[in-house]
Amino acid sequence: MSYVIDRRLNGKNKSTVNRQRFLRRYREHIKKAVEEAVSRRSITDMEHGEQISIPGRDIDEPVLHHGRGGRQTVVHPGNKEFTAGEHIARPSGGGGGRGGGKASNSGEGMDDFVFQITQEEFLDFMFEDLELPNLVKRHITGTDTFKTVRAGISNDGNPSRINIVRTLRSAHARRIALSGGSRAKLRAALKELERIKREEPDNLGDIQELELEIAKLRARIDRVPFLDTFDLKYNLLVKQPNPTSKAVMFCLMDVSGSMTQATKDIAKRFFILLYLFLKRNYEKIEVVFIRHHTSAREVDEEEFFYSRETGGTIVSSALKMMQEIMAERYPTHEWNIYAAQASDGDNWNDDSPVCRDILLKQIMPFVQYYTYVEITPREHQALWFEYERVREAFEDSFAQQQIVSASDIYPVFRELFQRRLVA
């Protein structure tokens, strides 16, 4: 009898390669479904998996076959309706196609193919080809920094890093391989001994011979050690270079009275999308949350998304606070500084020029990228036009977009953080 020991690392996911090939093949269908899911989901469901539906006609393999078109000369037997030399009209619907999956009194159809993508796959497609623009390495010191990461299993290592599960699995496989033949013979001998005792109880010679053989087989099996040095498996840890780039993202959200609940919800969904993108794509990045109405305040993540505080509108208060925090905690020669601002554009008229001056003189010269999102279905107001002057001065590091409804969130987000081709 042969024994096959499966030592593959991904034994529970034997179709991983096939699944990845399938996802690559139907990438466009999946990306479209992900975009639609992001637009319709609530804030709390933003990072879950998704069911993907692919039309049945799109999963058919190409097949070479005889076409139904062209002119053919065919001789049919005559009948009472047709006589020699008459031409028969071409049958309608001769394309050989299939139905679209709906009810019909003729033809055949195929249901859409539906499958589930995981949370990791959903986020991979959602943030594909996105990055923080102008990210550079700053504050390079003379010493390299490293981080320790898992790199599989090794046969040698420190006893403190022994992998008990893999060790016992290896020992069990070795015992099966070394004693499998003896165990099979032992089972056969025990079965034969039971038969002889039942059918030939007086055949003492054969009984003694079988008992002696059984004792030898058991002794041979017992000599196989439970654990051998060959079985020991250790977690392998290696050092990887740790990039020295440091980045911080400032999130500025308008919570003034002019922001309706629907507008605030759109702003929160935009910032949650941004927060997921940062935490997933960048291992070390700090996020500073600032809420503002007539005054600005730095808050934590919980208060930023769920506080109900409101008031008037002075946008410059948030910009001033951002500038103060930059000067106090984030030296520009060490940090890549980014900012994302969301507002409905409603601001005290005398304050909009102040916002422009703060951006032009105190913020934009020191940041890598600044994005402004205006959430309103109405015409733009003074703040938007002042920010246009900032964009003219900093074309590569300042961007502004308008969001009218929730369906615009994801397209605008991709437009703001689309990976740029470097010439």
Curated annotation (Swiss-Prot):
Q: Where is the composition biased (Gly residues)?
A: 92-102
Taxonomy, superkingdom: Bacteria
Pfam families associated with the record: DUF444
Q: Give the InterPro entries listed for this entry.
A: UPF0229
Task: Write down the NCBIfam families for this protein, in alphabetical order.
Answer: PRK05325.1-2, PRK05325.1-3
Q: Which PANTHER family match?
A: UPF0229 PROTEIN YEAH
Listed name of the protein? UPF0229 protein PA0587
Q: Which organism is this entry from?
A: Pseudomonas aeruginosa (strain ATCC 15692 / DSM 22644 / CIP 104116 / JCM 14847 / LMG 12228 / 1C / PRS 101 / PAO1)
